[in-house]
A protein has these predicted regions:
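N-terminal leader/linker segments that initiate helical-solenoid repeat arrays
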Residues: 48-102, 110-119, 329
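Helix-start (N-cap) detector for alpha-helical repeat units in TPR-like alpha-solenoids
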Residues: 57, 63-65, 98-99, 132, ...
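Register position in tetratricopeptide repeats
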Residues: 76, 110-111, 150, 184-185, ...
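Conserved structural position within tetratricopeptide repeats
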Residues: 89-92, 126, 163-166, 200, ...
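Canonical tetratricopeptide repeat
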Residues: 103, 136-143, 177, 216, ...
Length: 329
């Protein structure tokens, strides 16, 4: 959203004024000047309007909006460096425009200028009005949390997502992001609480986001060695509808859970599905080797283990299984 569009959205009569001022004939310049003065007076009296001040004229806003639109097009076409220049120019013209700074943060992030992006996102949040931009600020809290998590700053990530949830406990994206943060630091119980709360807010029918959260919940159950929970959580997921990496994750978690419940044939079936997608998947071949070993199918276990070590000679679990196979009965 452009700065001038933000004004039109939040100031009722500005919705009609913006197109009208473009149509006014030249002979009405005096009336226009009076009207602009009136608009400036009214806008400056509104506590929530952070985009307009006596130092920023409507002409400046319009020019900045045109520059910002140019930045939008450059960003969409992947010309991030030039887009950043446009957004910086627009931001300099309207120092209180939080929206262009939000775009600038995304552009810096696309350029891998991570710390600059985080700093700019904080500036956008500071400029946003707590009441008028309440939902927008909450979204930005979550985005800032994601940025910090991506660069490994877990404490700051948790700080920002907590702020979003404090303001809106039912904010779905915030619950999902906090779940991922807590999962990262292995606070599995707390992560499950957020993930399950997020699932309760989602529609029952399957969606890409719901499946993604279900996979993360199953992953935690897998870490906790709770195979029955893994199978229950993934039972409604059809791997054929997923991207290959997601499908492999689901098959692998199912296979491990089935092996642990001694449903060996079903486990092998899941692992074979993985090898169709990726014949060189070392972890799948290891689980296959361990499944055959538990079945007492020694020859197949040894052959599968040899494949694992060919793909990854330093696979820790495979090396332990190799020692176990070599030890006297």
């Amino acid at each position: 959203m452009l700065a001038i569009d933000h004004i039109a959205k939040n100031i009722p009569f500005a919705k009609t004024y913006v197109p009208i001022q473009r149509l006014m004939p030249t002979r009405h310049h005096k009336q226009l000047a009076v009207f602009v003065t009136l608009v400036a007076f009214v806008l400056s009296s509104l506590t929530g309007c952070r985009l307009f001040s006596s130092r920023v004229t409507l002409e400046t806003l319009t020019t900045a909006a045109e520059i910002e639109r140019g930045g939008d097009q450059l960003y969409k076409s992947g010309h991030y460096d030039t887009a950043a220049n446009r957004f910086e120019e627009a931001a300099a013209m309207v120092p209180t425009d939080q929206l262009v700074r939000r775009k600038l943060a995304d552009t810096y992030w696309a350029e891998n200028r991570y710390h600059a992006a985080i700093a700019m996102m904080r500036t956008a949040i500071d400029l946003a009005h707590p009441a008028i931009d309440r939902e927008l600020r909450q979204e930005w809290f979550v985005r800032l949390a994601e940025m910090n998590l991506d660069i490994g700053n877990v404490d700051r990530a948790l700080h920002w997502v907590d702020r979003a949830i404090e303001e809106n406990p039912q904010m779905l994206p915030a619950r999902v992001v906090r779940g991922s943060i807590l999962e990262r630091v292995q606070s599995y119980k707390a992560a499950l609480e957020d993930y399950h709360y997020a699932l309760s807010l989602m529609a029952e029918e399957s969606s890409a986001e719901r499946v993604r959260v279900e996979i993360e919940v199953a992953r935690i159950y897998s870490h906790q060695r709770r195979p029955h929970r893994v199978l229950a959580m993934t039972s409604a997921i059809d791997p054929r509808t997923l991207q290959p990496t997601q499908a492999i994750d689901v098959h692998l978690m199912r296979a491990t859970a089935l092996r642990d419940r001694q449903r060996f044939a079903d486990a092998v079936g899941e692992l074979q599905q993985i090898l169709v997608l990726d014949t060189n998947h070392a972890q799948a071949r290891f689980v296959l080797a361990s499944t055959y070993w538990q079945q007492r199918d020694i020859v197949r276990a040894q052959n599968s283990l040899a494949e694992v070590l060919r793909l990854n000679p330093n696979h820790p679990a495979a090396l332990r299984l190799q020692q176990q196979m070599a030890s006297p009965k």
